[in-house]
């Protein structure tokens, strides 16, 4: 069977070049006589893999020396708890609610302290990013938390919130390495990277060193203390070795393709193709305010649930898979992450035009 165009929100499409390299090395990684799946995380082979991955990531993102890079497990959902456990010194933090994942992080933080809603776009089904220029931040807040790209609803912060000097924590799960960022504007950047970077099972966290201390909330498990992981170079216990190996290959692919500035241009070009069609379509329509549209996740609807289902079914049969919207919102969603080729978006739009002609 030929490969399909995979529009899954995550785990998601990976560069074919990376998959081919991994396939070639599956039985024998660089003369080791072993697959990376089989080798010890304490081996020289894997030590080189994880160090090389960090080096390439630091180069791609221009990560300052006073930030630690951690390769972790547990998904973004576990990290929802790690943030307050490690950062809530005053037991108070501000959260901006722009979708399901910010809501879940907010609910988790409430377990550990006084989590305050600073702004929300729930009033319009999270179809926009609220004004974050003058948030009701108080002096005793330990940090301000955002989900920078909202995978389900298809919104993206185009400008970071004014945190009034407070530490900014950002979940970038679905926009990680899709464009250049100024790491120094954040205290913590993290994501479950099974969208733009690798397979499921790897969390990458970039944390300013002064925030990595023994001063965690009482009862914080040893494994969930960032200092435990930082002191052991992400090797306190067995890490997700194969996932890190694939991430490392994606980092090298991104560098080979020209880096994050080039990736942003490519991602903007792909998104424009799809959004331009949606803006003139008589059948399909987007669901997000134009100024807040994500380059990564594009939700759309026909306005008829039965027609939506028909579209998803026929698209799947035509080789455009995983277009069904998240179960909480319905409709459709095309996730066009960095590894999705422009051709995939162009062919999807061709199919949508054909479907519109037959069903409008």
Regions found by a protein language model. Give the residues of each.
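PLP-dependent enzyme catalytic core of the Aspartate aminotransferase-like
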Residues: 2-4, 317, 330-360
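A glycine-/small-polar-enriched, mobile loop at the entrance of the PLP active site in fold-type I
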Residues: 3-54
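Active-site C-terminal subdomain of aminotransferase-like
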Residues: 15, 193-275, 289, 358-360
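PLP-dependent aminotransferase-like
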Residues: 77-144
């Amino acid at each position: 069977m030929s490969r399909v165009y995979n529009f899954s929100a995550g785990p998601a499409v990976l560069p074919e070049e990376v998959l081919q390299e991994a396939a070639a090395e599956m039985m024998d990684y660089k003369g080791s006589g072993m697959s990376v799946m089989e080798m010890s995380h304490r081996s020289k082979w894997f030590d080189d893999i994880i160090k090389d991955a960090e080096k390439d990531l630091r180069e791609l993102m221009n990560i300052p020396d006073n930030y630690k890079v951690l390769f972790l497990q547990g998904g973004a959902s576990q990290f929802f708890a790690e943030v307050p456990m490690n950062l809530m010194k005053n037991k108070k933090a501000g959260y901006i609610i722009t979708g399901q994942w910010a809501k879940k992080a907010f609910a988790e933080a409430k377990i550990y302290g006084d989590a305050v809603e600073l702004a929300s776009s729930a009033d319009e089904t999270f179809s926009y990013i609220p004004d974050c220029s003058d948030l009701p931040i108080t002096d005793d807040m330990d940090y301000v938390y955002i989900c920078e790209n909202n995978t389900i609803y298809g919104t993206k912060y185009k400008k970071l919130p004014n945190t009034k000097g407070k530490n900014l924590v950002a979940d970038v799960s679905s926009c990680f390495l899709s464009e250049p960022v100024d790491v120094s504007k954040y205290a913590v950047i993290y994501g479950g990277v099974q969208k733009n970077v690798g397979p499921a099972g790897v969390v990458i966290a970039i944390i300013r060193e002064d925030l990595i201390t023994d001063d965690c909330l009482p009862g914080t498990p040893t494994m969930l203390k960032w200092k435990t992981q930082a002191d052991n170079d992400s090797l306190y216990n067995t890490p997700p070795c194969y996932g890190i190996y694939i991430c490392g290959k994606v980092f090298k692919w991104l560098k080979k393709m020209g880096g994050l500035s080039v990736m942003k241009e490519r991602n903007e070009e792909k998104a424009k193709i799809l959004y331009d069609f949606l803006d003139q379509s008589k059948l399909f329509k987007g669901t997000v305010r134009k100024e807040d549209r994500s380059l990564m996740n594009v939700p759309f609807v026909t306005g008829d649930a039965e027609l939506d289902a028909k579209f998803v079914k026929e698209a799947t049969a035509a080789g455009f898979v995983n277009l069904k919207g998240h179960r909480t919102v319905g409709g459709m969603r095309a996730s066009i992450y960095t590894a999705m080729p422009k051709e995939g978006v162009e062919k999807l739009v061709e199919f949508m035009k054909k479907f519109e002609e037959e069903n409008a």
